[in-house]
From Swiss-Prot:
The gene is swc5. It comes from Aspergillus fumigatus (strain ATCC MYA-4609 / CBS 101355 / FGSC A1100 / Af293). This is SWR1-complex protein 5. Component of the SWR1 complex which mediates the ATP-dependent exchange of histone H2A for the H2A variant HZT1 leading to transcriptional regulation of selected genes by chromatin remodeling. Involved in chromosome stability. Residues 172-182 have a biased composition (Basic and acidic residues). It is found in: Nucleus. InterPro entries: BCNT-C (IPR011421), Swc5/CFDP1/2 (IPR027124). One of its GO terms (biological process) is chromatin organization. Residues 1-124, 155-197, 265-300 are annotated as: Disordered. One of its GO terms (cellular component) is nucleus. Residues 282-359 form the BCNT-C domain. The keyword Transcription applies. The lineage of its organism: Eukaryota, Fungi, Dikarya, Ascomycota, Pezizomycotina. Residues 12-48, 98-113 have a biased composition (Acidic residues). Keywords: Activator, Chromatin regulator, Nucleus, Transcription, Transcription regulation. Coiled coil: none annotated.
Amino acid sequence: MASEPAATVADLDFDNEQYDSAEDEDFQLDPDQEDADLTGSDSDDEATEPAAKRRKTGPTKAATEDQELDSGDEAMIQKVKARKEGKQKGKKSQGTASDEDEDDVDFDDDDEGGPGGFVRTRAMRMRMQEERKPLAKIDGATVDVDAIWAQMNAPDSSAGILPSQTQAKDATPAKDENKNADTAEEQVLSPDSKPQYKEEMVKIKRTYKFAGEVITEEKIVPKDSAEAKLFLAKGESVETVTDADVEHAANAKDALKLRRPLRKISRFDPNPTGTIKKSWEKQPTAGITGQTENISGPKINTVEKSRLDWAAYVDQAGIKDELKEHSKAKEGFLGRMDFLNRVVAKREEERRNARLKGL
């Protein structure tokens, strides 16, 4: 029984042993508490240790978190407040502040838009303070605006004419009006007026070979035209036509203009009837069938073809009379060349005489 109390006392002594935190790996000291312990010293320690040897404490955990959450707006707000206080002090000391020292951005109490530090520029404030001009009113108008608007919208063309213009028109003499009316009637009737006699129309039909092709032309032209004269100069006979034939030819020409080419069959279209396959087959040429042998005509060169085209252009442009007048004039190309040759010969003769006199 005596051994049991001894063991109990040993156990009690083991429990009362002092705990060493340096040997415990799981023990971690709170940094805030550690800083507090370092900074918070007794009065005796402060008296004995000099101030230069005091340990400087770093930023606390709360200050670090605030710095991480700082987006720059807080610094902007503080800068604005500091500048505003500086301006107020400057105004008190100097009396008035010069405009040259002011920045482009003015900071007022109303310009701060809250925690974001939004500021309004000078142009933005002026735009906000600018008053819109009121719309025009017709309260003091002496003219009936509605009547004028209705008159302007009226389909009558004389609505936009001023009264002064109408008075000037009424003041013109009646003789001028009669003259203008007569000239206007003449201008209107002149295009539609028919000549006293009808031109004799002839039918030209020619067949010729040019550039390997057989061309057949059939035209109805006036007998006095350039094409008719060129055709008659070759000794060909023409056929005189009547007015009915001319109208029929004109109607046929108009009908041809309205015709449109048929749609060409494509190889990519569906082919239920086999029409596309037939279109692929090579068609027999005119030479194989002997059609060229039946058609006879003279072979013309480029000069003769140009002469035919020029005659057609003269009739189409209506410059036959103008060409006839210039062809009879003395100031033609050959006459000018003769004049220039005479001038050159005279100069050479004068030079030769000058050289002979010098000798």
